[in-house]
Amino acid sequence: MPLEYMGGRLATLDDVDVRGKKVIVRFDLNSPVGNGGEILDDSRIAEAAGTLRELCDRGAAVVALSHQGRPLESDFVSLERHASLLSRYSGVEVRFVMDVIGPEALRTVASLRPGEAVLLDNTRIISEDFIEAEGTVHARGIMVTRLSKLANMYVNEAFSASHRSQASIVGFPYVLPSAGGRVLEKEIRSLNRAVSSGERPKVVVLGGAKLKDAVRIVDYLSSSGVADEVLTTGLVGLLFLYARGYRLPRDVTKLLEKKGGEEAIAKARRIVEEGRRVRTPIDFVVEVGDKIYIKPADELTEGVPKDIGPSTVEYFRAKMRGARVIVMRGPAGVIEDPRFRRGTVELVKAALSSGAYTVFGGGHFRAILRDLPEHLSSKVGHLSTGGGALLYYLSGRPLPGVKALVDSARIFNLV
């Protein structure tokens, strides 16, 4: 059935007939890579395998695309190992071509038969796929022009890259009938429920260290009325305490200035001055030298706050009680260190015990949820792998990749 997005509708795999068609599928197989080129976390590849298998089972010939890393960085590698893993997880033999739009790639795509699949190499080998431009502009580019001539349909299965306006994300929907893949569909449906449904109250818990994005999200959620409560943790909580005039150790204020800049600090101050409903931690777990203390928020004169304290956990737990929807994005502390993991774990437990529909955003939650007892972990509504796309969604900004699918549904009369 069609999927609602920002007042429009896009097609899903349930709305299109793929039998006998050559389908370009843009996955996001981008994964952490070790020094030897080995893939350290293949969860995105495993997730993509289901969609690839479905399309092949339904009689499509699948041309898979993805990026990996950024040019000149250590994780900018070929997708050959990705193809091997995609084959293993999907049960489909996925051929690999060390080419994207050259003669070998085009010959392979042209000869592909129903039920077969090929993964072309890293799309960012092509400079067009590292340029931000409108979809109608990218539709005239070399990558989209060459590949679309050999295909009948396009599927976006890269929700986590859909905040980018790059050729392989936004160009194809303007020249080929296009639909959202299963992972993208699940992300949008879950986030629509979390943000756009009439279920109230909605509580959003924001932590982590991405201050510019977090302040933009707080600004949108608190001004639009989307969230009934915004609870801040991590560096985000410290930023809003700083905006309220709390004295913080110099090392902390320098970090806030470095991570957020004057713009984020000024915006946080404006939000505070307008009296919006943004809650901040009331105590912290603080590391001072080789010792650890619990300190109230108004006594942070030395050391480095590494986690929220027990009083904050109880304060925020009370705010979650009775919520119908809870969204958590970013950790409450430095969870890589077991000593500073408790705040995040306890908030996750509180959310799952509340009876609310819960959405967790960020890869760090995967490990935490895996360690919880089954009676709690089974209550997870949705674990988003959206990354930057999730931040865009929560801040009310349109996702170019999804908007292009809405446009395609209209252009090709798909829904």
Curated annotation (Swiss-Prot):
Q: What PROSITE patterns is this protein classified in?
A: PGLYCERATE_KINASE (PS00111)
**SUPFAM superfamilies attached to this UniProt entry:** Phosphoglycerate kinase
Q: Name one GO cellular component term.
A: cytosol
Residues holding ATP = 336, 362-365
Instruction: Tell me what reaction this enzyme catalyses.
Output: (2R)-3-phosphoglycerate + ATP = (2R)-3-phospho-glyceroyl phosphate + ADP
Any Pfam family hit: PGK
Keywords (alphabetical) are: ATP-binding, Cytoplasm, Glycolysis, Kinase, Nucleotide-binding, Transferase
Pathway this chain belongs to: Carbohydrate degradation; glycolysis; pyruvate from D-glyceraldehyde 3-phosphate: step 2/5
- List this protein's GO terms for biological process: gluconeogenesis; glycolytic process
| Keyword Manganese carried by entry | no
Q: Where does substrate bind?
A: 28-30, 44, 67-70, 124, 164
Q: Which GO terms describe its molecular function?
A: ADP binding; ATP binding; phosphoglycerate kinase activity
This protein's record includes keyword Zinc-finger: no
Q: What is its EC number?
A: 2.7.2.3
Q: Which branch of life, at top level?
A: Archaea
Which compartments does it reside in? Cytoplasm
| HAMAP family (UniProt xref) | Phosphoglyc_kinase
Q: Which family does it belong to?
A: Belongs to the phosphoglycerate kinase family.
- What is this protein's record name? Phosphoglycerate kinase
